């Protein structure tokens, strides 16, 4: 199956939703629909219906429109089998499970940390990741339910994906993330270059998504907790402890 089209659209204040469909198709997949009207607009623009809905986690700003869309389009809802706080999935899925929608194969990656039941979806044949609130451009989600060891393990799973993986996350937080990253890694020239681009995108009211895993490994401090630089910076060689200190610093930045 050829590469699907991915349509990013804004929801609420700073959320992103995604509509995935194959070229010339009239149905596709919505990810984390929270703004019903915006979801209808993106579907209408593409003369399509939502055959499926994928849920990454149970926070209201990622699921608020799920039931209304399911009722309107008879959509198949897919979500983590262990998350009893999401709308009841028609297809419950688990870590490592692979399922197919419209010829595209999706792999489920369990990424606890932001919530205990958070999952990512990876389109295997095209190296496309929908990371929800686990990984952002130059940042990561707040640690509401997990612990540092758990969250670092989740990020390490993402780090093991192919370097050309395109990452589509749940929020436009990049500008604030960049400011924090520069405060602890000011001499990182890859980060400085990315910051220039992010500022330009912000000035032009353009999204900073998607990013790539290669770019994030160079620029995202939360993926670099196992680097020599942060070993020295935090005087530790334990990545999960470094992550804990870094996440706390970002929370208070």
Task: Name each region found by the language model.
Residues 1-46, 120-132:
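Conserved beta-strand hairpin/beta-sheet module of binuclear metal-dependent hydrolase folds
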Residues 19, 98-124, 128-129, 160:
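Core dinuclear metal-dependent hydrolase active-site scaffold
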Residues 20, 32, 57, 69, ...:
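Divalent metal-coordination and catalytic microenvironments
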Residues 28, 35-108, 193-197, 201:
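Active-site HxH/HxHxD metal-binding segment of metal-dependent hydrolases
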Residues 31, 77-79, 130-131, 169:
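Hydrophobic residues in well-ordered beta-strands that form the structural core
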Residues 33-35, 58, 82-83, 114-115, ...:
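Active-site metal-binding loops of divalent metal-dependent hydrolases
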Residues 139-165:
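Active-site-adjacent loop/tail segments of enzyme domains
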Residues 156-166, 175-253:
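Accessory terminal helices/loops
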